[in-house]
Amino acid sequence: YDGNNERALDGLNLKIRRGTKVAFMGGNGSGKSTFFLCLNGIRRPDTGKICIDGKAIEYTRKGLLEVRGRVGIVFQEPDDQLFSASVYEEISFGILNLGADEETARREVESVIKELEITPFQDRPAHALSGGQKKQVAIADILVMHPEVMILDEPAAALDPKHTKKVQQIVDHLTEKG
């Protein structure tokens, strides 16, 4: 992986049931983030394949859009994920990129902004936010697309206790919905 002769992942075979929460734990450099990036199609495995519902990921534009609509990832470092001029535009990008019409996107974005308490800074530049605010926006980026699988890489990093609890409540609610 990236010039290193060691395998980040080897012999991994995993089935996760819908409506469950799973935690992947391990030390730094153990392959957790690499695994997450493979699940979302951001990183392609050197050997083997990634299957979702028994279907291998297709590394074409269409195939990657499909998998990213189904599997959303919130990066460990929000700055690796945020790139739009304003928070509102940032949260709108993914759902519009997946083909939602502007009215549907507006409704969904406004709902997530309210749910995650982003309204006070929705018009600010994403790069000017605090670490906790950036994490909230990164979570909203994915939540607005209603993925079947939502991967949160170190979800509580840089969040205050109030927002850590809010993220946990959202994850619990999504898990209950299946």
Residues covered by each model-derived region:
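The feature captures the beta-strand-to-loop junction immediately N-terminal to the Walker
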Residues: 25-27
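Helix-to-loop junction immediately C-terminal to a conserved catalytic motif
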Residues: 40
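Conserved ABC transporter NBD signature motif
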Residues: 48-59, 67
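Conserved ABC ATPase "signature" region
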Residues: 103-121
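Conserved ABC ATPase signature
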Residues: 125-129, 133
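Conserved catalytic motifs of ABC-family nucleotide-binding domains
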Residues: 146
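Catalytic Walker B motif of ABC-type/P-loop ATPase nucleotide-binding domains
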Residues: 150-153
